[in-house]
Amino acid sequence: MKLSDFSFVLPENLIAKYPTQQRTASRLLHLDGKNGKVEHTMFADMLKFVEPGDLLVFNNTRVIPARLLGKKETGGQVEVLIERITSDTTALAHVRASKAPKPGTKLILEEKVNVTVTGRDDALFILQFDHDETVLTLLEAHGHMPLPPYIDRPDENSDKERYQTVYNEKPGAVAAPTAGLHFDDSILNALKEKGVNLAFVTLHVGAGTFQPVRVDNIQEHKMHAEFAEVPQDVVDAVLNTKANGKRVIAVGTTSVRSLESAAKASAERGDEQIIAPFNEDTEIFIYPGFEFKVVDAMFTNFHLPESTLMMLISAFAGKENVMNAYQEAIAKEYRFFSYGDAMFIERA
């Protein structure tokens, strides 16, 4: 398949720069992958799409304030985006500077954080933080929320709360699992009251999620690696749900990728069950032709043209159905990307 198959033109004014005042105040487009039918509603009404006994699977990663601005000791400006914390005092990071820093280069970030570049790991730089406090403590104190490049504004205090799900638990992401941003405590309680079961996986979203696909033949694209964990209690909940003839509904593409990574690993080992616990990096790339083993429906935001996430939802609901739904969303002026509106998609 060609990259251009997943292209569409999005008017600039439809890119949401800020979230809605209330988390549940977004619009919700319902797409039935079986027939391509589209329905327009509000996220606050999402309960009508779920039934008692269904399982909703959320990603409980916590976004770390991973962006640090500063300068080299010699004076040149630098911008650091932590990709992964590797120990209490080290991290892998993207570093933007007029000249790539060499090993031994010292950086002064946010006027208080002293860092030494110790080497490279592919496109990433290995950083040593020269402090007694942990990297995470330093980031929580001095870092900026790593807003995506298309939210073209400086981060604000409100982003510390709003670019984070209400159920976040495990620090490690440098981008939010954005479908989850629409859920607040009252809607989570309403789901439980309705008899819907909730489960939590972890996938630490990396900055690679914003990297463009650079090949024309999408099968040649190499996915970035992200850490994912699907614990035993989630496996049990999935198997239980399937046994009862109910649906597994993923909240976000990261939950889809976590569950299907666990299922893929299970199949490769020749397990009898469709899914088993998973606790490692995943490079799963889901595009049309992929056979879903676990996920029956999903909540997701609107994605960038030609992105791997467009390919994932096209695999899930049919490319033509997705492209038609997107054209309708654009015509009706839905808000796009991380702080934008949501979709509820049922599998083709």
From Swiss-Prot:
GO BP: queuosine biosynthetic process; tRNA wobble guanine modification
| MF terms in GO | S-adenosylmethionine:tRNA ribosyltransferase-isomerase activity
List the keywords (alphabetical).
Cytoplasm, Queuosine biosynthesis, S-adenosyl-L-methionine, Transferase
| InterPro entries cross-referenced by the UniProt entry | QueA, QueA_dom1, QueA_dom2, QueA_sf
Give a Gene Ontology cellular component term annotated to this protein: cytoplasm
Q: Does the keyword field hold Cytoplasm? A: yes
User: To which pathway does this protein belong?
Assistant: tRNA modification; tRNA-queuosine biosynthesis
Cell location: Cytoplasm
Q: What is its EC number?
A: 2.4.99.17
Its recorded reaction(s) are: 7-aminomethyl-7-carbaguanosine(34) in tRNA + S-adenosyl-L-methionine = epoxyqueuosine(34) in tRNA + adenine + L-methionine + 2 H(+)
Concerning its family, UniProt says: Belongs to the QueA family.
Q: What does this protein do?
A: Transfers and isomerizes the ribose moiety from AdoMet to the 7-aminomethyl group of 7-deazaguanine (preQ1-tRNA) to give epoxyqueuosine (oQ-tRNA).
| The protein's assembly and partners | Monomer.
Write the protein's name: S-adenosylmethionine:tRNA ribosyltransferase-isomerase
Q: Which organism is it from?
A: Alteromonas mediterranea (strain DSM 17117 / CIP 110805 / LMG 28347 / Deep ecotype)
Encoding gene (name): queA
